[in-house]
Amino acid sequence: MKKLSFQQIILILQNYWQDYGCAILQPYDAHVGAGTFHPATVLRCLGDKPWFIAYVQPSRRPGDSRYGMHPNRMQHYYQFQVILKPSPDNIQDLYLKSLESLDLDLKTHDIRFVEDDWESPTLGASGLGWEIWCDGMEVSQFTYMQQIGGIECYPVACEITYGLERLALYIQGIDEVKELDWNGQIGEKALKYGEVDFEAERQFSKYNLEFADSEMLLRRFKDSVEQCERLVKVNLPMPAYDECLKASHYFNQLNALGVISVTERASYVLRVRDLARICCIKWLELSSE
């Protein structure tokens, strides 16, 4: 039987969660370190309104730059994010059935929920969570969101994050991400993951580790902090959150360059967390009016 391509995995997950009742959203057009940073998660998990969504999110982690030479670690990758609020009682069964939709036979594979409570210091977010392993490889993260921006989430939302590359490696039986079948075609139409993304991976790795201008990034970080605070004051939490995301990415770039000391790092994390918090507070304030 032909193995699912990378894009087929995404389409099947979209269809599965759409059939459950989720709205399929689009990726957020900003540099984020994980699917959780999408405002559809950060802002919409707050408050008491139901929220059922799913989306793919390209994510960037400058510190994971490896010039495209590492078999499964990249500075740019993809996650599939699901938010179910309020969390249904049968969430574990729903997740396992999503794996079955990807032709994973649960009777022949060792699926384990390994306790791993989740925390994002820069978002002031945390929750009870589990890593989901399939035959010893982590393929997903499962979290009951308890707080975001330091604010308690009620009702509690369930977040499921599929690591698409890891899942595809397992499904296709491949050891290196760049060798993944992207589109399931043969001949001149066939595409591998590496043909789509790895030249960018090489170039952005050089930029992140060698050519990024630290003084410019420091200025941009400061500017984004000031803009975020200013926009919150004029009741614009969504543009303000964009500036928070920019500040977070600039911090990650500075960290990848190695120009931030351990002591300074804690200060930067706290600064970004404070920005996320004021955005969340203002969002809640306006949405309750």
Swiss-Prot record:
| Listed GO biological process terms | glycyl-tRNA aminoacylation
- EC main class here is ligase
GO MF: ATP binding; glycine-tRNA ligase activity
Top-rank taxon, per record:
Bacteria
Sorted keywords for this record are: Aminoacyl-tRNA synthetase, ATP-binding, Cytoplasm, Ligase, Nucleotide-binding, Protein biosynthesis
Q: Which GO terms describe its cellular component?
A: cytosol
Q: Could you tell me what reaction this enzyme catalyses?
A: tRNA(Gly) + glycine + ATP = glycyl-tRNA(Gly) + AMP + diphosphate
What EC number(s) would the UniProt record show? 6.1.1.14
Keyword Zinc-finger appears in the UniProt entry: no
Q: Does the keyword Cell inner membrane apply?
A: no
Where is this protein localized, as stated in its record? Cytoplasm
Q: How does it assemble?
A: Tetramer of two alpha and two beta subunits.
Q: Which family does it belong to?
A: Belongs to the class-II aminoacyl-tRNA synthetase family.
Q: What is this protein called?
A: Glycine--tRNA ligase alpha subunit
Q: What lineage, starting at the top, does this entry show?
A: Bacteria, Pseudomonadati, Pseudomonadota, Alphaproteobacteria, Rickettsiales
